[in-house]
Amino acid sequence: MDITVFLSLTVVVFLAVIIFYGRNEERKRMLQKIPGAPSLPLIGTALPILYRRKEDRMTWIEEILEKYKPLILWYFGNRPFVNISSPELIEVVLRNTQLIDKAFLYDLFHSWLGTGLLTSSGAKWHQHRKIITPTFHFSILEGFITIFAEKSEILVRKLQKEVGRGPFFIRQYVSNCALDIICETAMGTSVNAQDEGFSEYVTAINKMTDVLSDRMANPLLYPEFIFKLTPYYWTHKKCLKVLNGFVNKIIQERKEERKKSKVTQTSEDADIGKKKRVPFLDTLLDASEDDNKLTDTDILEEVHTFMFEGHDTVSAAMTWLLFELGHHPEIQEEAYKEVQDIFQGSDRVPTMADLNNMNYLERVIKESLRLHPSVIYFVREAHQDFELGGYTIPAGTNIDFSVPFIHRNPEIFPNPRCFNPDNFLPDRVVNRHPYAYIPFSAGPRNCIGQRFALLEEKVVLSYLLRHYRFRTVNKREDSKFKLEMINTPVKPIQLIIEARN
């Protein structure tokens, strides 16, 4: 090698090292100014979490957040996280269009969800969000109400066998109902999960979320080569085979149906009203045929994402809601009275007007999501330095939000651990900071399916309340939940059911 070239390369490398070291030191100085929890080398703040039982981890986290609120620095491995809990700081982050990228933790989902709407960033996220958004147009959601109703009627019928039999576990019933709904509305396919009972897909998705939750909580499992040496990897691999097989089968069946019926959306469908009951999958398939805006891999990733977000989160929300109604018979009866006033003893399918008139039931649902948000953590990554709460947050820092902690702020919600639907009376909502309640996140990267989820819950609950009374067996203190991706109770929720007629 020419000596001049060698010296030039040496100088370049030397300067790069100096710049990197200088920037790293500057970053450390910025972070040291932020109040933080005790941290250890390599593992960071994770040790106190790891040696606690799963059911005690959230309690410890809430104690730390309470001590340092509204802003705290902690480390997972060598990665800095800044947790924020005041609505004012949350608004700064969630409204910032430069802070819409998800943190590195979401990379752990890539083997399953790829880079779908939940995990993607940059141009891909913007393109996919634009393609998918019309799927949740008002008139399309209205067309799904009959499907919500059909599956709710099956749930009512299935629960009949539990009448008079004592305590039973509710989660599997609502989980199968949610799976039936998401498959038919989003994929255009009936899987009959409620009638056929056991669902290999539901079992696989539950095991997969357990694996990913444990991996996210343990920085030692972040490196892929270490993860592959553990039993977690083999569980992950088996589950992925089931999940991919299930979703690929749905996609192929839908493609065949479209070929046979030749029913596709085209640019001639200018009237949005014509798009009623258009499955989410059809929107993706249309986009793949329209100048190849989406590849087959894109479709697989988005279907996985929608199935996960539209099934697990809704079934968790409905389970917790029944837990609360079973603990508060007076609230349950008030919701029943509202439903009865609307239906007048009829078992008919609700209309959109009916659902819009379920004001009390909507407050009940929102209050349940306040105490038991389906997703308990959101994390964003800063790609450039920015100011937050009087501190400079350096690029590369992860910004995280504990949704239950935010929702239980006594300065915003009096008696925050008490279930009180009046928290969502119009006069209280209008006087509350808009970022004090974020069960579906907020800002430009909020949950695209939140309206879908609320309508689904209203329909299902309107059927259940017309037919049954529920009483919760679990004690109030059993409302503790695990540190997992989806809000899961420490003790599975048991109910006693009584027929109204």
Swiss-Prot record:
- Residues where heme binds: 309, 447
Q: How does it sit in the membrane?
A: Peripheral membrane protein
Q: Name one GO cellular component term.
A: endoplasmic reticulum membrane
Source organism: Blattella germanica
Q: State the SUPFAM superfamilies in the record.
A: Cytochrome P450 (SSF48264)
Induction per UniProt is:
Expressed at all life stages.
Specify the domain of life of the species encoding this protein. Answer: Eukaryota
Q: Which UniProt keywords apply?
A: Endoplasmic reticulum, Heme, Iron, Membrane, Metal-binding, Microsome, Monooxygenase, Oxidoreductase
The protein here is known as Cytochrome P450 4c21
Q: Which cofactor does it need?
A: heme
